[in-house]
Amino acid sequence: MPIITLPDGSQRQFDNPVSVMEVAQSIGAGLAKATIAGRVNGERRDASDIISEDATLEIITAKDEDGLEIIRHSTAHLLGHAIKQLFPNVKMAIGPTIDNGFYYDIDLDRSLTQEDLDALEARMLELAKTNYDVVKKRVSWQEARDTFESRGESYKMAILDENISKDDRPALYHHEEYIDMCRGPHVPNMRFCHHFKLQKVAGAYWRGDSKNKMLQRIYGTAWADKKQLADYLHRLEEAAKRDHRKIGKALDLYHMQEEAPGMVFWHNDGWTIFRELETFVRTKLKQYDYQEVKGPFMMDRVLWEKTGHWQNYGDLMFTTQSENREYAIKPMNCPGHIQIFNQGLKSYRDLPLRMAEFGSCHRNEPSGSLHGLMRVRGFTQDDAHIFCMPEQVESEVTSCIKMVYDIYSTFGFENIQVKLSTRPANSIGTDEMWNKAEADLAAALTANGLAFEIQEGEGAFYGPKIEFALRDCLDREWQCGTIQLDFFLPERLSASYVAEDNDRKTPVMIHRAILGSIERFIGIITEEYAGFFPAWLAPVQAVVMNITDSQAEYVQQVVKQLSDAGLRVKADLRNEKVGFKVREHTLRRVPYMLVCGDKEIAEGKVSVRTRKGADLGTYKVEEFVEMLKKQVRGRELKLLGEE
């Protein structure tokens, strides 16, 4: 006679074991119709699963995050159902959920085309609209293996052989004649899986191992209703338009080439943006009382062995040899900063010591993971390390948080997700040390009025950390900033200070990054602004153009005035119609276009237009210079005439 406790605290008693669906039906027909699965004692279970003892139960519907994930997982099975009907000889591998969708890896004797994807999608919809029931059956290990052996599903057999104990009773999900194996849960009926889109096919090695066979990975997205799907596809279209790789090429910001994979060739305009970001961050370093340093980009293997990087990070490090010594190109800046700290005796009076560097780092990322500026091998970190005493941690973290938000707000990022990662199983240090460190980070976040998500056990082995993720205009999340406590590295590299009692003590080190990789951050803001950089960041802030040759000298005078004021300006004296010039510079996303005709010369003015098409009328040259300088100085996000 199980007693089921519902989320509102109410209880229902049943005379016999009862399924999740039957509990939903006892509450109401509407809830039963919406039921996808249940959370029994906090564990996700299928709607058909039986509850035989007292338990808590939450019904999962399409409105829940878990419900949407289950819809996506079941849509992956629906894809398997359709593939087996259209390509009976295909072998199915794995089909998990991912962010916003799912994929299925398959072994097929020919490459899939876009026409194949269209046909698969049509068959999936045809099957889903029959609203068939998904039937779950628990079977013995041997019965599961016999089932897949009879169907020639060698990858499913391998999963059973290598990953599932022979004592287990795996769950087989029956989609009419199609059978798949999964931990579940899955939807009880395919009426929940009507809103999906197959997106692309890519290659993927079985088990992620390049020694294994290359399979075809079919990616798809699935949503709870038609509007959610349409909104997501619209965001994808917008993301494609904003792709920093396309915009970077169109605006001549940078390029990459095969001879230097994952390394950026910055062109003049892209490098201008890069240097402006550095200049901006430098103003903040001064404001928040940091020293700026510069360490070598390559150091002896001996040092990296001391830090543990050689043993734990070796695959991602580029190495070289000289005069019988082995060196590693630095993947991060922290060991170098400790070397600087160790030069000369440090007293407690010297702490906190805040050390920052625009450090050039290299990591040997797999070639398949490289993606424009977002994932590179050579990058520059706006890195800092703060050496402090334990009692200074909370105040220093508070200062870091303020700096993070100060910088992000300048770029218009207001929606920032904050996560606190706590002690992992493989941590070093005492319980007391960790408890205080986690409490200090939480207290700093709370003192700043920040809501945060706790990620249990997700901290580094050497200390807890705070992560800051930016949510952009397309609702994508970009993890950029980190504040990481480190009890480990300073001790390993013999960092110490003389405490007030004259004892030698090891400082706490706080790793702090805000932009993260400057290259990646440029990719992020290129997509956020769609290449319409605010005036202070724009490589060219204004173009001055003539209507006829008679205004050429005046144009040059205006250009000199703007240039002398420290503004980035160009002249366009080509023998082209002014409309053609305006269109061209609009496509180049130049913030302001200044047109000089005879009337403007007579009045000592310029006619001002913006890249968004606003006609701002005429300005005295001095007025425009002051207006633009004010915008640049204030790092304003919008141009004149923009709301």
From Swiss-Prot:
It is found in: Cytoplasm. Residues 243-534 are annotated as: Catalytic. Its cofactor is Zn(2+). Transmembrane segments: none annotated. Binds 1 zinc ion per subunit. The keyword ATP-binding applies. Its EC number is 6.1.1.3. Zn(2+) binds at residues 334, 385, 511. Residues 1-61 form the TGS domain. It catalyses: tRNA(Thr) + L-threonine + ATP = L-threonyl-tRNA(Thr) + AMP + diphosphate + H(+). GO terms for biological process: threonyl-tRNA aminoacylation. The keyword Ion transport does not apply. One of its GO terms (molecular function) is ATP binding. Its main location: cytoplasm. GO terms for cellular component: cytosol. Coiled coil: none annotated. It comes from the Bacteria. Catalyzes the attachment of threonine to tRNA(Thr) in a two-step reaction: L-threonine is first activated by ATP to form Thr-AMP and then transferred to the acceptor end of tRNA(Thr). Also edits incorrectly charged L-seryl-tRNA(Thr). Belongs to the class-II aminoacyl-tRNA synthetase family. This is Threonine--tRNA ligase. The gene is thrS.
